């Protein structure tokens, strides 16, 4: 029985008579059955990788699974023949609220590639019921509300497996739910998500407020609960320990069921620690092994040979460090092991910068990972060099053999085959259909660089995608885009280092320029998508400024035909899948040396956008691949920025005082026009922040940014030359396939 026959059998009625909800439920169950029929990926070497991460931003799964199972076209045609539109069926599916930003999206891409490459490897995380939060805009400000996603019809499968997890004053019993991870034309792996039996969504009050002390009911409610107070920090520790204790118990259970000796755990298991949230897996595994009769020395050796750590940040504040008294309050049974690990380091090394426990009695999670793991990797070439030579230099001096680079990647199944089908049709027409299995085949598109017909068709594909975005946003939110404008897009977490505030200053510059009578040749539409962490005040202030500008421009008849600002509400994977194919100018403007890699830059590039960015993260490698003519680079280099920090010689106020243009743009934030729309206190806060602090050097780069952006828009008018830039970017994007990244992880670290 083929997939279509199974679908109709599961549905139990004629497709034409079924509702979209009924068809979605039948498709989901048929996909689950087909994934099981594909069978698990099994390692020939008897080794398995477990990828532990606090977040997995997996996006909607229906279409991705249909593509990976090789039945998408079959299902689409079957539905169409019965008067149904697969796109409408897709809209029934809720997006899982299991991630936030690039960290979680990378984890999702990696699981897709691990399965596609036929490697035996599963993800381990938590089953958050309400996600990060659902973002709504009220009074030009972000408001957080719960984001429930779990329905009776769900990709989650109750495994019947659970473990007891001990805390200081009580223990919790877990429930394990699995989500199938289908490989493209390959076997199936699993994403294991642990939950508590006693979770209670009803304890959430106004917005996303809840009793942070009620661990028995709140533990798996929210991803990254507000940690601006002690209760929030303790809840984070409860969450992290619950995740790693379940993960460690599950891993040992699988090993014992396979008949492996736990004395040889490292021969059969590799645990990839994705950022510092899962770091307690190291002492927890040691605890579980010693409880089974293995000596402390041997347990430490086994765990060190089993665990590998991926560093995702250059920001010191993101490298977690927990006060000892907090850990004693939550997991006192781990502290003797952590103290033992710290004592062994202290006995060998005098340098205070490598100690696991610092002079303020805080436990540094990343330091524990580096001492008691066998691999430390960065996620872009520049990032890894900064780790080795600056941020983590004391560790590189001790363990040079542990450090390696694994430049991030994205899955082309979702970020091309699923979300940009018109571009895929164009690619197939011009002979690179093999990219589905070998992304390097995209280079074959360079043969069309002087083919005017192909270039015009490529421009037409982009225009169709812009029109599709216009129709989608108008239907979803009532916002009407001008699809004849240039689409300039910045979508990513709202953080000062990503410098959405610099984009704001460009908008102000352009607004004032238009008011002075200088109309652009072509209208410009600036699109933002971003959530700010609930306790991150400055980030929320920046959103307020963007929304005020959106309102100001919309209601100014002199400016509205030429300049538009749109901030999409509740930016998520589904929205990204609409925005990325329509983007023409990709904003990657973080302060050089601060973005570890970025993957949005790769998605935009793959879909034919041209990058406007700093020499930061993976932008450096994009620049190397496409050449100077096909990317727009501005701003000071990472070396220059690092030197500014070392010398403390950047003073934002000097730029504000000495440059009348910068002063004019910054002061516009508190102009009568803005104060009429916005909250006075909020606008004053962000105005003062830019002048008095500006930790991420917005005013240092803003003039170069504006000049470079104006050059981008001027070059856009030569449509054939622009189309050639698009082709080069698409053709060179093959390097950024997560299949390549995972192949390198397996070659150098996992050996599955």
Language-model segments: residues:
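A conserved ligand/cofactor-binding region detector
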Residues: 1-752
């Amino acid at each position: 029985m083929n997939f279509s026959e199974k679908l109709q059998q599961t549905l139990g009625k004629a497709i034409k008579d079924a509702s979209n909800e009924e068809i979605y439920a039948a498709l989901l169950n048929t996909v689950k059955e087909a994934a099981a029929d594909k069978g698990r990926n099994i390692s020939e070497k008897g080794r398995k990788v477990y990828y532990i991460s606090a977040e997995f931003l997996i996006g909607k799964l229906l279409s991705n699974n249909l593509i990976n199972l090789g039945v998408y076209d079959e299902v689409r045609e079957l539905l169409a023949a019965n008067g149904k539109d697969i796109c409408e069926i897709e809209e029934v599916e809720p997006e899982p609220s299991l991630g936030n930003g690039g960290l979680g999206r990378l984890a999702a891409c990696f699981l897709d590639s691990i399965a596609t490459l036929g490697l035996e490897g599963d993800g381990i995380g938590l089953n958050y019921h309400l996600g990060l939060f659902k973002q709504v805009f009220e009074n030009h400000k972000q408001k957080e509300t719960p984001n429930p996603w779990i329905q009776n019809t769900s990709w989650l499968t109750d495994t019947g497996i659970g473990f007891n997890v001990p805390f200081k004053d009580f223990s919790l019993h877990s429930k394990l739910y699995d989500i199938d991870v289908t490989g493209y034309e390959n076997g199936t792996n699993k994403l294991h998500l642990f939950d508590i039996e006693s979770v209670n969504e009803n304890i959430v009050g106004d917005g996303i407020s809840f009793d942070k002390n009620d661990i028995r009911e709140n533990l798996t409610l929210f991803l990254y609960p507000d940690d601006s107070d002690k209760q929030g920090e303790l809840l984070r520790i409860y969450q992290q320990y619950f995740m790693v204790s379940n993960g460690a118990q599950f891993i040992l259970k699988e090993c014992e069921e396979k008949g492996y000796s736990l004395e040889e755990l490292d021969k059969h298991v590799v645990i990839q620690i994705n950022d510092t949230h899962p770091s307690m897996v190291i002492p927890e595994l040691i605890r579980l092994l010693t409880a089974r009769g293995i000596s402390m020395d041997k347990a430490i050796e086994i765990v060190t040979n089993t665990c590998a750590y991926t560093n995702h940040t250059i920001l010191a504040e993101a490298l977690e460090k927990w006060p000892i008294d907090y850990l004693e309050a939550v997991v006192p049974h781990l502290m003797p092991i952590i103290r033992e690990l710290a004592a062994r380091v202290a006995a060998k090394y005098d340098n205070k910068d490598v100690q696991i426990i610092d002079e303020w009695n805080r436990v540094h999670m990343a330091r524990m990972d580096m001492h008691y793991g066998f691999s430390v990797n960065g996620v872009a070439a520049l990032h890894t060099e900064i780790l080795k030579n600056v941020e983590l230099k004391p560790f590189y001096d001790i363990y040079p053999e542990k450090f390696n680079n694994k430049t991030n990647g994205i899955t082309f199944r979702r970020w091309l085959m699923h979300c940009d089908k018109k571009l895929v049709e164009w690619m197939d027409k011009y002979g690179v259909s093999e990219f589905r299995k070998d992304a390097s085949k995209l280079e074959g598109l360079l043969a069309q660089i002087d083919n005017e017909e192909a270039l015009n068709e490529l421009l037409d594909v982009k225009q169709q995608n812009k029109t599709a975005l216009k129709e989608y946003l108008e239907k979803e939110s009532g916002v009407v885009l001008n699809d004849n404008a240039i689409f300039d897009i910045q979508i990513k977490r709202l953080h000062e280092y990503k410098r959405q505030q610099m984009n704001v200053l460009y908008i102000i510059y352009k607004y004032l320029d238009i008011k002075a009578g200088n109309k652009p040749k072509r209208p410009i539409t600036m699109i933002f998508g971003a959530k700010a962490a609930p306790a991150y005040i400055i980030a929320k202030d920046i959103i307020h400024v963007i929304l005020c500008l959106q309102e100001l421009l919309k209601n100014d008849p002199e400016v509205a035909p030429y300049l538009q600002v749109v901030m999409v509400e509740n930016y998520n994977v589904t929205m990204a899948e609409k925005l990325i194919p329509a983007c023409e100018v990709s904003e990657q403007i973080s302060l050089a040396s601060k973005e570890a890699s970025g993957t949005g830059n790769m998605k935009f590039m793959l879909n034919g956008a041209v990058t406007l960015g700093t020499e930061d993260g993976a932008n450096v490698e994009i620049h190397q691949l496409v050449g100077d003519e096909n990317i727009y680079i501005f701003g000071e280099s990472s070396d220059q920025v690092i030197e500014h920090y070392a010398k403390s010689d950047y003073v934002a106020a000097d730029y504000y005082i000495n440059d009348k243009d910068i002063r004019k743009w910054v002061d516009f934030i508190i102009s009568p026009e803005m104060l009429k729309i916005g909250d006075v206190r909020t606008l004053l806060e962000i105005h003062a922040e830019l002048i008095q602090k500006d930790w991420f050097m917005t005013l240092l780069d803003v003039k170069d940014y504006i000049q470079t952006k104006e050059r981008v828009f001027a070059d856009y008018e030569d449509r054939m030359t622009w189309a050639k830039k698009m082709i080069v970017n698409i053709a060179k994007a093959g390097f950024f396939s997560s299949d390549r990244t995972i192949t390198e992880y397996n070659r150098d670290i996992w050996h599955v």
